[in-house]
């Protein structure tokens, strides 16, 4: 039996980016629709194959299959809908019809050509309930779903130009085709992926090291999500630079650790998002994906290890899930230890994100055992250079920080 764990999901890596010479002619005369940042990130990720085998936004058959059966209409496992919404009033005003092509723009620059294969409606309450396991608007994914307009446009997207990625993200922007070549050049036959939206404390570090041991991996690919931010989150610059410095400071050897970014806005869909993450990292060339406690969860909507259990209920997606428990500080062991090994359960001290954040907010360097000093220094440096003095997202950051990606003008 042939192991397909180095193959993209669906067997073929999607890449839909126009040749610069073609762009002017392809977009001439198209109706234009401006879009927000979330759609931009999804379009770029679709066009470069992060979401293979998808070539664009889902039609009704795919949405229905994903919502009810956690698979695409073709039968491939898929867990989170990817849709493009538009109000019917706007559709009517622009006289958009099935079979049309329209130009989506960002900040008045051409983004993608959307070939409209279907215009449809869908029950948003049904979608939210199936995907998130709740219809409560306190859940951020439910709120996002209810915020969709009343119609959806399904169809393939083609990126008009290569995006411009600003610093410090530029060196971490590696589309699947590029990253796969880099991992092959490193000799990483077994690569384990780490999903994160945080600056790393030592619990995260040992989560990665434990998964490396458990999977007998050649290397660890840290793949932070860069997307929508809320006040109080770490700024993206601090996250990606903080992750990268673990290798630069020697906590991982140069040949067993790498960092690349993923444009994606978290849905906080718990176990369903865990499956989505596994598929995306499979497309990046990873053979394994680590899943710890409360993966992609929010509040108390999901069980601690629901993201582990879901892999027992679905067909093999072509990437090995590495299921780990919690790493924490044990004062009796006098170090970082693992829930599956340590017998001092009553003494364990969990890594409190809120406590660490409050210490950092005061400019105090946390104890080395829970936060590497090099990480702290990078985080504070990022705060000064990119965060207007704060390593956390503020209203000023939301209003004034430049987008991570923009689109160039198309030369005629």
Regions found by a protein language model. Give the residues of each.
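Active-site cores that bind ATP or allylic diphosphates and position pyrophosphate for catalysis
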Residues: 1-412
